[in-house]
Amino acid sequence: MHPSSRANGPAPHKPYNPFYLQLYFWVIIAIILGALLGHCYPAVGQQLKPLGDAFIKLVKMIISPVIFLTIVTGIASVAHVGTVARVFGKAMVYFLFFSTLALLLGLVVAHVVHPGAGMNINPVDLHQGEIANYVEKSHDLTLVGFLMDIIPKTLLSPFVGDNILQVLFVAVLFGIALALAGERGKPVLNLLDALTVPVFKLVQMLMKMAPIGAFGAIAFTIGKYGVDSLVNLGGLVGSFYLTSLLFVLVILGAVSWLCGFSILKLIRYLKAELLLVLGTSSSESALPSLMEKMVQAGCGKSVVGLVVPTGYSFNLDGTNIYMTLAALFIAQATNTELTPAHQLALFLVAMLSSKGAAGVSGAGFITLAATLAVVPEVPIAGMALILGVDRFMSECRSLTNFIGNAVATLVVSRWENALNYEQLKIALDGSEAAYQSLHANDAEPSVSR
């Protein structure tokens, strides 16, 4: 397998500048300063929310073009519809398997740690006003409605909305049509291929504004919710963070090792994106950059285009851990006994509802509301217990989801024999000489079957 030169591919990052010129350093500084400001001057911190919101809106502005161009050019280059179906099928098998593991891990940890034991909360005494909005939104989450929502009203409507799956749907169909057009479709493919250059250049421009967005978002979070809210529910928050860490290092670490790469090196490779996700509490904020870096790490372009956007809806490992752990925490805190049958129902409902909340703001909390509504044994009023700390768990959910999707892309690429190991090693090792060798000709993975 040898990388082929590509003069018009996305411009690579140049991570070998001094550390104080690198993006991740300034994101760290922004997070620290934002946290200090939010803690010392809560009112001022809350006023900075527009900074984080504006940055996320800017990133979402570019997500649709990035997904569309990556998928269409990737599929049209493959020119085999069967290959697209095979990649999608393998991705869904992976997503289902690891989503199941994440849900089971949350259940196991809740039984071992018992984070809600001894709280003796009476659900009647809980204030339910603040969770009413989440409960109302959860009523709209149905599997049929979710599937129907993937189909857009018009060909252009996905590009003016915020439903990633609709963009994915249109891009796959257009890419297949372009592949079937053969030589007559080449001019269109070349045009779309050329458009990737300014689009990914725009992504790099927007990423330079990440410290500003992270500063505003973290200042708002600390200013509004405060670190004190973590004390009372520290058992739940700590259990969730440790469980997520266990999932990433042990489960994802094991599958990474089996596929020939290190999870720790992958995390180091994606450190700037992970810090951005931490600061903004949104894994979507780093989606364009993740797609670019996965291609640079040797993954097939068509695989990246299919797996990453789909994973943002179907491969939510952090959200799955949160669902079962939080549900059992509420049951323990309210002294609600759950039989094995109840827990099995909880598990199955969580598996389905986590897919139906894809792309919804506050998806983790809304999905939990939908799950508890179907499993009435766990009092839905108990959600009021965790509302105050849910924002702090949101960061961990987003980070785990993000790492899970990066690993999924590499695993499916290897499974599909579309992973350039030489290019992956160069990217993850991060040596300057190797980097310069890799990008001497703006290389992009090209794998012969």
UniProtKB/Swiss-Prot annotation:
Keyword field contains Secreted: no
Pfam family for this entry, one: SDF
GO biological process: L-aspartate transmembrane transport
Cell location: Cell inner membrane
GO terms, molecular function: fumarate transmembrane transporter activity; malate:proton symporter activity; succinate transmembrane transporter activity
Major location category of this protein: membrane
Domain of life: Bacteria
Residues passing through the membrane, by range: 20-42, 62-84, 91-113, 164-181, 202-224, 239-261, 344-366, 370-389
Keyword terms of this UniProt record: Cell inner membrane, Cell membrane, Membrane, Symport, Transmembrane, Transmembrane helix, Transport
UniProt record similarity statement: Belongs to the dicarboxylate/amino acid:cation symporter (DAACS) (TC 2.A.23) family.
Family matches, as PANTHER family: AEROBIC C4-DICARBOXYLATE TRANSPORT PROTEIN, PROTON/GLUTAMATE-ASPARTATE SYMPORTER
Function: Responsible for the transport of dicarboxylates such as succinate, fumarate, and malate from the periplasm across the membrane.
Record's protein name: C4-dicarboxylate transport protein
Organism: Xylella fastidiosa (strain Temecula1 / ATCC 700964)
